[in-house]
A protein has these predicted regions:
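Short beta-alpha connecting loops at secondary-structure transitions
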Residues: 14-22
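Flexible, low-complexity linker and terminal segments
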Residues: 32, 37-184
């Protein structure tokens, strides 16, 4: 439903970067979820996987899923770092994360804006720097071949997710030649 999509895209507190993914059918659910977990680990950002009632209750015979090497590798901080900065400004936008209990890896985590060490800050410079960092990690990441499932050619595109994908694919094939070319 459109409302679900709007909440997933815009329903978080503040300007927090997050990922929204959706399977296109029953056979795509496992791969989409694996990819969401991998991206959440790599980008240190929440990932939302959209589904719908039909996909959740469907029974289908599908091919055994491939076991692709989707490994979410965290940027980890070295042990014993003297000046650990949990939210360090890095070229990739992803800061090294200390495993809990790592010597020298303590930091403050709360819901307020902060500087590189995690200390809450109301300074405009800290806010601007951290917002740019959050944006850059989504923009600079290589999402690979799974980024989007786009079929067709044309200037118009129909965006869909979940169980609506099959009927829309069929409708576009029936419109072929009678309507402007569209992508799905």
């Amino acid at each position: 439903e459109q409302g679900d999509l709007n909440i997933a895209l815009h329903g978080l507190h503040g300007d927090a970067p997050h990922l929204v993914l959706a399977p296109n059918g029953v056979g795509d659910c496992l791969q989409t979820t694996r990819w969401a977990v991998m991206l959440a680990e790599q980008l240190q950002a929440p990932a939302i996987v959209l589904s719908d009632q039909f996909l959740g209750q469907a029974r289908a015979a599908i091919d055994a899923p491939a076991d692709p090497p989707l490994a979410g590798e965290r940027a980890r901080a070295a042990a014993g770092v003297a000046d650990y900065r949990r939210y360090a400004l890095t070229p990739s936008g992803v800061s090294p994360m200390a495993i809990p209990g790592t010597p020298g890896g303590a930091y403050t985590a709360d819901g307020l804006e902060h500087g590189e060490r995690g200390t809450p800050s109301s300074q405009a410079a800290d806010h601007v720097a951290q917002m740019a960092k959050r944006r850059s990690k989504l923009e600079l990441h290589d999402y690979g071949e799974l980024w989007a499932d786009v079929d067709g050619a044309g200037e118009l595109a129909v965006v869909t997710f979940g169980s609506c994908t099959g009927p829309l694919r069929e409708a576009l094939s029936q419109l072929a030649g009678t309507a402007p070319a569209m992508r799905l």
